[in-house]
């Protein structure tokens, strides 16, 4: 499967070559299982389309479509630069990249936002970005569960959004 081709339409919306090339390289590193699983392995937290096979891809594309719409608004463009907007564009693709853990568990692992952040920080690619940019994108991924930070099945408490960008990535 050509992973990059799946996201070609999203990549075409990037405004900077630097972050587009980085995102393209990172897409190649996403575990294969992400391209076949439903977005909700328990069938509870996503719509019917996203709970079907390949639903995770639908989830990413829907998230990205809304993200791109909002990033194109005059108000948002006045408050952000091209690079910031492109980092935000990475989030729909990266936020669930390790959704079922590093080994592809049958179910979503509660810690997956933290695993996604770790994956962003630690993965080296040909068109890599600086550590501050990686940390920014990682934090967007880590806080994407919003106020739903805990579960009885895990001792891990996920971080809540701390700023407007993180809040935006949670509720889009």
Model feature map: region roles:
Residues 1-104:
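Acidic/His-rich, divalent-metal-binding segments that scaffold phosphate/diphosphate chemistry
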Residues 56, 83-86, 90, 109-113, ...:
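Short capping loops/turns at secondary-structure boundaries
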Residues 56-59, 95, 110-113, 144-145:
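Histidine-centered active-site/metal-ligand motif
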Residues 60-66, 110-126:
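An active-site-proximal "capping" alpha-helix that borders the catalytic cofactor pocket
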Residues 78-79, 88, 128-172:
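Histidine/acidic-rich helix-loop-helix segments that form or flank divalent-metal centers
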Residues 103-108, 157:
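Metal-dependent catalytic cores of enzymes that make or break cyclic nucleotides
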